[in-house]
């Protein structure tokens, strides 16, 4: 049986696909050249056709609420989100985002579990693959990134310090003796961490620990993510990579948070 948590710390799940140019357009330092201004307009026209095709594919899948993030006529650079698409059912919070060279699936609370999110993501991937320009359909995605962003509120560390809470998750902070001798650890003591390591098979695992704020209340952010490079542009290949990443992240999260599961209020579903 799967386990969900009534007091889950999850803030957002993000699956991001990238392709094409990795550098902003136009090139740095050449913005005054008339030829590059023309290129920007031409590029924008090509992007708009892709956006319209993607929007039509989303609409046919029940995602007809569109929101443009970048105003019409403004320059758009590779990797910048331009449109968001949501379900007609306003009770569903998940959304798709698209821009030149970037596509994301965003899962927001109330998170109904991976199978539900995976089904929504599959619809988004179908829409993306059906709307890619013909000259790009065989090109690999340069990267596939999945991130689980968790925010632990003060109810998780109200009886202890932030550092003690992080230690309960397995994060051990070791500072030089000179700093330890003059410091006084209390609720104002914190640390930020960005840990990146390689995984078997060539992917990367990233763990980020940082302070954050949610609805005006301080939280402890713990983000787990993976990145795979050069992924074949098929739904089968994409879902396989994403599911492998999900399973790894879920195992790390469940093992890491085992000491505080009682506060997360687990329930079988």
Task: Provide a role label for each language-model segment.
Residues 217-269:
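Long, compositionally biased interface segments
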Residues 79-91, 95, 140-226:
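Aromatic/basic-lined ligand-recognition segments
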Residues 1-98:
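N-terminal low-complexity, intrinsically disordered segments
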Residues 19, 109, 148-152:
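Short, flexible loop/turn elements at secondary-structure junctions
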Residues 114-118, 122-153:
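Surface-exposed beta-loop interaction hotspot
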Residues 1-3, 149, 267-268:
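Solvent-exposed, flexible loop/coil segments flanking beta-strands in beta-rich domains
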Residues 3, 105, 109-116, 233, ...:
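Conserved aromatic-histidine-acidic binding/catalytic patches
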Residues 85-129:
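Hydrophobic alpha-helical segments and helix pairs
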């Amino acid at each position: 049986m799967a386990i969900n948590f009534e007091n889950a710390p999850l803030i957002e799940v993000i699956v991001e696909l990238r392709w094409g140019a990795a550098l902003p357009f136009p090139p740095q330092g050449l913005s005054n050249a008339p030829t590059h201004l023309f290129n920007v307009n031409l590029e924008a026209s090509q992007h708009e056709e892709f956006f319209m095709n993607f929007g039509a594919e989303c609409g046919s899948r029940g995602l007809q609420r569109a929101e443009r993030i970048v105003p019409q006529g403004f320059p758009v650079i590779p990797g910048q989100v331009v449109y968001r698409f949501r379900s007609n059912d306003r009770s569903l919070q998940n959304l798709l985002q698209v821009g030149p060279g970037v596509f994301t699936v965003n899962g927001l609370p109330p998170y109904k579990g991976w199978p539900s999110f995976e089904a929504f993501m599959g619809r988004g991937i179908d829409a993306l693959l059906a709307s890619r320009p013909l000259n790009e359909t065989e090109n690999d995605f340069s990267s596939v990134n999945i991130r689980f962003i968790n925010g632990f509120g003060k109810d998780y560390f109200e009886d202890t310090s932030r550092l003690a809470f992080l230690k309960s998750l397995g994060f051990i902070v070791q500072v030089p003796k000179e700093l330890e001798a003059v410091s006084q650890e209390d609720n104002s003591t914190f640390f930020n961490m960005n840990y990146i390591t390689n995984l078997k098979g060539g992917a990367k695992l990233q763990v980020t620990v940082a302070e954050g704020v949610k609805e005006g209340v301080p939280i402890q952010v713990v983000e787990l993510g993976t990145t795979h490079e050069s992924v074949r542009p098929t739904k089968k290949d994409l879902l396989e990579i994403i599911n492998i990443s999900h399973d790894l992240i879920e195992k790390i999260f469940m093992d890491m948070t085992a000491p505080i599961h009682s506060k997360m209020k687990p329930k079988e579903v």
